[in-house]
């Protein structure tokens, strides 16, 4: 190329028939090569990277593949970095997110593929100190992942419809205006969101560990408390299946669920416990996890300690009665003999049914005679103040028990030292029931 002065142009831009070229120090146009230089019409501007194709023309408004990597150039030929919007007609720095058309190029200009980026949203300046940053994942096609990414380095991640990775409690939501489905974080400060409001719920940890948890128990805060810095808020156990879905009883099931109350062992007796500040009953669903039975409320929170079922659900195999699910970090239905400490640290014996039969139900605390011991809602009744005492069951059945809880059924004087505590010597032998069952030896 020869300039207007008739001299050979060297190491400079050349414009010819509306196309732009660059010549090297020998005056030959460069092809299939890069140049870091100032723009064609502004020598005072910052240098940018440009690519010149096999015909020498500057790459403009297009994607170029160079050494198996993709690069994007705007209408002025400038190589773009960061978020880029591209379709077959135009290339530009991204001002917002466009599904299937938003890509990310690193500082070398190469499009990221099968890789993560922690960045501000498209259209936001990188140096904006007030701007939030998010994790984005770009697939092998270079397109940003939205929705559920099921095999990202062996893990599942959830993204909203603008490609932002979601953390904490995440639910599949439906827009009221467009009916579009989208994975969004739920809960947080001032939130009234409850897990029972949603069908598909996942738990994805924090932004440093954002994959959906799977096939495990996970203990964490409710959605409304998850982002709260108050560590005094209660945490609950949730079951997450192999697909990452948090177990939440379905709306259809909850309409026929059993109902019950929480209890605690307090001062040697079972006392009703408040739930969410009240003594109102709540719905209960039984679910088997890893061959063990658990109770859940409608928000998928595993229940523990003592639960009395007052409205049964035969479909779940739940009958009325007192059940025990161990401590706060256990939760599996207990059967057989159990030792439980009360709030004072004293230990008491319980017995819960081991099978369903005419005399007991699996998991239900025995009320009455079991192996010649007297129980009430599973709690072994014993003589406390004296060697023998009369214990009443359901205000109808009366038993004589000793300090071990053994039922006495002889027509004798029951003494402690020389004092007669209970005089049954005048009773007929038939006064003690001999009918086999829970009330055998009752008076």
Locations of the language-model features?
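Extracellular adhesion/carbohydrate-binding repeat motifs centered on closely spaced tryptophans
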Residues: 1-443
């Amino acid at each position: 190329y020869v300039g207007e002065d008739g001299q050979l142009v060297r190491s400079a831009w050349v414009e010819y028939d509306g196309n732009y070229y660059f010549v090297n120090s020998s005056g030959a146009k460069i092809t299939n090569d890069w140049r870091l230089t100032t723009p064609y019409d502004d020598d005072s501007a910052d240098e940018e990277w440009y690519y010149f194709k096999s015909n020498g023309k500057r790459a403009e408004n297009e994607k170029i593949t160079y050494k198996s990597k993709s690069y994007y150039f705007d209408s002025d030929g400038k190589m773009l970095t960061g978020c880029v919007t591209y379709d077959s007609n135009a290339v530009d720095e991204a001002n917002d997110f466009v599904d299937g058309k938003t890509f990310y190029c690193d500082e070398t200009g190469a499009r990221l593929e099968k890789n993560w980026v922690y960045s501000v949203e498209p259209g936001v300046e990188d140096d904006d100190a007030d701007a939030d940053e998010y994790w984005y994942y770009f697939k092998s096609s270079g397109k940003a992942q939205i929705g559920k990414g099921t095999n990202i380095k062996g893990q599942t991640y959830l993204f909203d419809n603008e490609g932002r990775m979601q953390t904490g409690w995440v639910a599949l939501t439906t827009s009221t205006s467009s009916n579009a489905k989208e994975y969004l974080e739920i809960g947080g400060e001032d939130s009234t969101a409850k897990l029972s409001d949603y069908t598909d719920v996942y738990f994805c940890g924090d932004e440093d560990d954002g994959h959906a948890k799977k096939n495990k128990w996970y203990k964490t805060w409710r959605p409304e408390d998850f982002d709260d810095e108050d560590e005094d808020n209660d945490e609950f156990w949730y079951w997450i299946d192999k697909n990452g879905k948090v177990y939440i009883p379905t709306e259809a099931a909850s309409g026929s669920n059993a109902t019950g109350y929480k209890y605690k062992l307090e001062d040697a007796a079972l006392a009703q416990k408040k739930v969410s500040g009240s003594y109102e009953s709540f719905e209960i669903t039984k679910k088997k996890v890893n061959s063990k039975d658990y109770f859940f409320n409608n928000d998928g929170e595993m229940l523990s300690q003592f639960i009395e079922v007052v409205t049964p659900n035969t479909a779940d195999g739940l009958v009325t009665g007192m059940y025990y699910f161990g401590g706060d970090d256990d939760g599996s239905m207990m059967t057989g003999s159990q030792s439980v400490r009360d709030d004072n640290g004293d230990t008491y014996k319980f017995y819960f049914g081991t099978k369903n039969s005419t005399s007991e139900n699996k998991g239900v605390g025995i009320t009455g005679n079991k192996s010649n011991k007297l129980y009430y809602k599973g709690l072994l009744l014993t003589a406390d103040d004296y060697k023998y005492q009369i214990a009443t069951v359901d205000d109808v059945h009366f038993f004589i028990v000793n300090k071990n809880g053994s039922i006495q059924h002889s027509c004798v004087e029951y003494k402690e030292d020389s004092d007669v505590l209970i005089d049954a010597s005048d009773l007929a032998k038939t006064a003690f029931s001999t009918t086999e069952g829970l009330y055998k030896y009752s008076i």
